[in-house]
């Protein structure tokens, strides 16, 4: 256990917490491991055992946020709402979370967007999670005969491709000035009608 009295996971969590604060206050370009280590109360060498470099620390910040988002989407998947409403809510939450992150935490969003453009492993895991959750929903919709004209796999693929500009981080940022939830909602509704939904 480090001399701070924190466990290894505690050091990691504290470093992430302090990094979030520094990004908010100064921008992610100004984050330095040596400064974070000093605030945590460990040597920068010790902090390297948790984060190989600055990029790894910034990735940990974004990964934590995406993990929270994945959990929100999972709660939607498991909710008692009708299946069409869950599919709709899934896409709206995915879009809304990224848009609000950019509006309220622009510097944190910049760090996330940078990782996203590089398709870091944790980004790929998030995308796989989103696809798996949606496939579960489309399979349920198929069983309920709301999707009858295509397979659940094809419906999942078409929904993800059609809604890409509402969920891709850089495109969300570029269209930040517009409230596009209505367009997204209408798009999902049109696709579901095309798949055989009432």
Predicted regions span which residues?
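N-terminal intrinsically disordered/low-complexity leader segments
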Residues: 1-10, 80
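C-terminal peripheral helix-coil segments that are non-catalytic and often amphipathic
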Residues: 2, 89, 132-143, 161-162, ...
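Short amphipathic alpha-helix in the helical subdomain of ABC transporter nucleotide-binding domains
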Residues: 8-11, 152-159, 180, 184
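Helix-turn-helix
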Residues: 14, 18, 22-56, 60
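Hydrophobic alpha-helical connector segments
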Residues: 60, 74-100, 156-159
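Short, basic, alpha-helical segments at the C-terminal edge of helix-turn-helix-like DNA-binding modules
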Residues: 63-70
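Amphipathic alpha-helical packing segments from all-alpha helical-bundle domains
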Residues: 70, 117-143, 153-157, 182
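Amphipathic alpha-helical segments used for helix-helix packing
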Residues: 98-118, 168-171
């Amino acid at each position: 256990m480090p001399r701070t009295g924190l466990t290894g996971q505690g050091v990691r969590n504290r470093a992430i917490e302090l990094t979030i604060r520094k990004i908010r206050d100064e921008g992610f370009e100004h984050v330095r491991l040596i400064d974070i280590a000093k605030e945590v109360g460990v040597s920068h060498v010790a902090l390297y055992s948790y984060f190989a470099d600055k990029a790894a620390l910034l990735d940990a910040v974004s990964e934590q946020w995406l993990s929270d988002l994945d959990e929100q989407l999972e709660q939607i998947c498991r909710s008692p709402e009708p299946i069409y409403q869950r599919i709709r809510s899934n896409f709206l939450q995915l879009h809304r979370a990224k848009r609000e992150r950019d509006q309220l935490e622009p510097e944190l969003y910049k760090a996330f967007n940078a990782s996203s453009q590089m398709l870091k492993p944790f980004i790929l895991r998030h995308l796989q999670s989103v696809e798996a959750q949606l496939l579960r929903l489309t399979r349920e919709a198929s069983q309920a005969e709301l999707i009858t004209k295509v397979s659940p796999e094809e419906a999942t693929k078409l929904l993800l491709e059609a809604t890409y500009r509402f969920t891709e981080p850089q495109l969300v940022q570029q269209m930040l000035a517009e409230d596009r939830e209505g367009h997204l909602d209408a798009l999902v509704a049109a696709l579901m009608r095309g798949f055989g939904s009432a």
